[in-house]
Amino acid sequence: MTSLSRPRVEFISTILQTVLNLGLLCLGLILVVFLGKETVHLADVLFAPEQASKYELVEGLVVYFLYFEFIALIVKYFQSGFHFPLRYFVYIGITAIVRLIIVDHKSPLDVLIYSAAILLLVVTLWLCNSKRLKRE
């Protein structure tokens, strides 16, 4: 098997990075559209007189924050030199589990397990932000 020359490897890397960047840019634009749709949906739910609409409003707010966090993750990717910071994924995980607790809270054992998962993610976030793992 022949080894690839350094310029060829850099060219392939550049092509793949460009494809990744374009894909993330498209994903970011799609998320902005969904964020706009969620804003309109939240406005509709806000003025609905039903009692059930309050739960739908809270769920919609958490989904709104999920869209917002994914968009912030993509922005941070471009700002940090094409690198995804781990803590943003942890934030998204915590928000997603909180949404799950709000939507599906019928089983107390499930809520306890979800809460333990949130605690684990918070500890992970604390460890990632500690000085031992801090990247300069």
Swiss-Prot record:
TM regions (residue ranges): 15-35, 55-75, 82-102, 108-128
Annotated InterPro entries: P_starv_induced_PsiE, P_starv_induced_PsiE-like
Example of a GO cellular component annotation carried by this entry: plasma membrane
Topological category with respect to the lipid bilayer: Multi-pass membrane protein
Subcellular location: Cell inner membrane
Primary location recorded for the protein, binned into one broad class: membrane
Residue ranges, Cytoplasmic side: 1-14, 76-81, 129-136
Keyword line: Cell inner membrane, Cell membrane, Membrane, Transmembrane, Transmembrane helix
One of the protein's GO biological processes: cellular response to phosphate starvation
Periplasmic side: 36-54, 103-107
Family: Belongs to the PsiE family.
HAMAP family linked: PsiE
Protein name: Protein PsiE
Organism whose genome encodes this protein: Escherichia coli O157:H7
Lineage, broadest ranks: Bacteria, Pseudomonadati, Pseudomonadota, Gammaproteobacteria, Enterobacterales
